[in-house]
Amino acid sequence: QPEAVRVWKEVEELARIVKAEDPRHPVMTVIAGADERKIREIMEHYPSIDILGINAYRGAGGAGPKLASLGWKKPFLLAEFGPPGHWEVPKTAWGAPLEPTANEKAANYYATLQSLLDNQEGLCLGGYAFLWGHKQETTPTWYGMLLPGGEKLPSVDAVAKAWSGKWPKNRSPKIASLGFVVPTEQAKAGTVHAVRAAASDPERDSLVYEWLVMAESRDIRHGGDAEKAPSSFPEAVQKTLGPECQVTFPPRGAYRLFLTVRDGQGGATTANLPFFSE
């Protein structure tokens, strides 16, 4: 890609200027994903780089092996890593990305950190988990490691285990399944459908279930820009009984049923179920 090559040559010139002015600090550049073409171009046209930063999500654990296979010999780090991104997952028939459960996301955090710790070449400087807090991005629960109330999600437990080798004294609950009792992801507005979840807690703490229907987000931005939270429809959920509830499909459109499970000890977990009112 001639344009990309011109960019890397220009960045090389800038790096030389920076090093001439400040030789005591390394020069680092961050790219999105461990893309083979980008890495080869950097190796050929940007020799002054000292540290390569990579932002990666679903495939973050493969960044180190990819660099090694291409002959990369300089330090690198994961400048951002987290759960599979909303652009990396399957979608429903109406285009809604399928969000992994908080527990499935935690497994991705753990596997990524293990890959960094197992880096045989000794070139990995570490990584930054995204993100310590909560954020509306595609959904209110996709990327945050904490709930708005401060409760930790399973991803916090996962990074603690990877860093220390030990699980926290109190671990977050787990949602094993969430779905309509009779598969009805698409149904007429106004119809009522039963939903059931299966959840558990490692310490057998009593669990509290919170159900909420929200519209599918329409304010989708790029690059992490702030998004408006979609409208919620609390009246759409009736007859909640712990891990079970009934949902009245709202007026025509795309929605999600969110489930938050709390253990009363500062831990929580989340999952959601997309559905479409016809």
Protein language model regions, located:
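Exposed beta-strand face motif in extracellular beta-rich ectodomains
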Residues: 253-257
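Residue-level recognition of secondary-structure-to-loop junctions
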Residues: 247-251
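Substrate-binding clefts and catalytic carboxylate motifs of secreted carbohydrate-active enzymes
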Residues: 68-223, 271
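Surface-exposed, flexible coil segments in extracellular/virion-facing regions
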Residues: 215-246
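Active-site neighborhood of glycoside hydrolase catalytic domains
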Residues: 1-55, 60-61, 66-73
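Extracellular and select intracellular beta-sandwich modules with Ser/Thr-enriched
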Residues: 267-273
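Short beta-strand edge segments in extracellular beta-sheet folds
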Residues: 274-278
